[in-house]
Amino acid sequence: MENNPSSKIEVAVSSRFLDQQSNRNEGRYVFAYTIRIYNAGNVPARLIARHWQITDANGKVEYVTGEGVIGEQPRLRPGEEFRYTSGVVLGTEQGQMQGHYDMMADDGTEFTATISPFVLSVPRTLH
């Protein structure tokens, strides 16, 4: 996979703790995250697959891969964005996610869009 300036995807993430869906007594902490994928390049591109690395506060790592996101493989023209919200369940009050998307430009060129690490944290627990 190659990366070049014409194929530039920006990814922004926000996360929040879902207290009502969590059960602290059972060590079940539910988080939602919203992703904004923006095509900052000058060629249309389609999101083909996702690759996540999810790490809890104990260092337990889970890898998740799959086609597209939320059942879609969105195609973004230059200047377009796609937003979606998904969720994750951790066994600890804090954790982290990071990963990348496999992308394909209209000309068939494959490239990677990086998802920088972001924090998952129950409010008032981050030190």
Swiss-Prot record:
Pfam families: DUF525 (PF04379)
All copies of domain ApaG, residue ranges: 3-127
GO terms, biological process: error-free translesion synthesis
Superkingdom of origin: Bacteria
NCBIfam families linked: PRK05461.1
Name of the featured protein: Protein ApaG
UniProt source species: Xylella fastidiosa (strain Temecula1 / ATCC 700964)
Gene: apaG
